[in-house]
Amino acid sequence: MEELILGIVQGLTEFLPISSSGHLAIFTAIFNSTPDVGYFAFLHLATFLAVLIFVKSEVFEIINGISKKDKEYINLASKLVLSTIPAVFVGLFFGDFIESVFSSTYLIGIFLSITGILMLLSDKLNKNLKTIKSIPYFDALIVGVFQAFSVLPGISRSGTTLFAALFLGMKKEDAVKYSFLMSLPVTFGAGILELHNVAFSTEQIFGFVISFLTGLLGLYLVKRMVIGGKLKIFGYYCFLASFFVLTFL
């Protein structure tokens, strides 16, 4: 049952800007069990597949453009790779520290508050100047740096990248697309690196399937909320979650 619940939590919260890793750590604390970082990473592969389906047209468009040596798509792919580098660096060199944070509900509560603040600010950002193809390389790097902070449980990956993209003047729909696209190598890498620690029990595989299905729902919801200017709802939720964690866990 625990694996099933964690699968639902991962699927829904991976793309909603409320921190999936933070919620997985919270529910692990509620269950009074040891954080299974390997299983958490396995669930990331489920949400990777959900994103791949959700942005399949953009992925095929990029692959097709690169195969035709279209400079515009080659540049876009290069920017996505650049956005990924900071998170990969942090994951490889600070993995032990990150794993230790999963056991600190106090830090998770603080980080959730930070995510809440970013979501309240995001709704006020509406420059609508740049598309995913027109953003400069420097902007791509900045978004990547923000994503790197999301390796900490409580700091939302989608929340930080959406905030950064909107702050830098990207159109809302393009900010969503860019956030989803740049999540692909990160979630895939996180899953593959820890795959050897997964038991592949029936419960874990079922949790994987549930995480995939709820991930698709989460993707749809966050796209609607960003375009509709309702990210502040997630901000208020993060404050409530932070209060709960700091008070009761």
From Swiss-Prot:
Domain of life: Archaea
E.C. no: 3.6.1.27
Topology in the lipid bilayer: Multi-pass membrane protein
Catalytic activity: di-trans,octa-cis-undecaprenyl diphosphate + H2O = di-trans,octa-cis-undecaprenyl phosphate + phosphate + H(+)
Transmembrane segments: 11-31, 35-55, 80-100, 101-121, 135-155, 180-200, 202-222, 226-246
Main location: membrane
Example of a GO MF term: undecaprenyl-diphosphatase activity
Subcellular location: Cell membrane
InterPro entries reported in the protein's UniProt record: UppP
Keywords: Cell membrane, Hydrolase, Membrane, Transmembrane, Transmembrane helix
Listed GO CC annotations: plasma membrane
Physiological role: Catalyzes the dephosphorylation of undecaprenyl diphosphate (UPP).
Family recorded in the similarity comment: Belongs to the UppP family.
Descriptive protein name: Undecaprenyl-diphosphatase
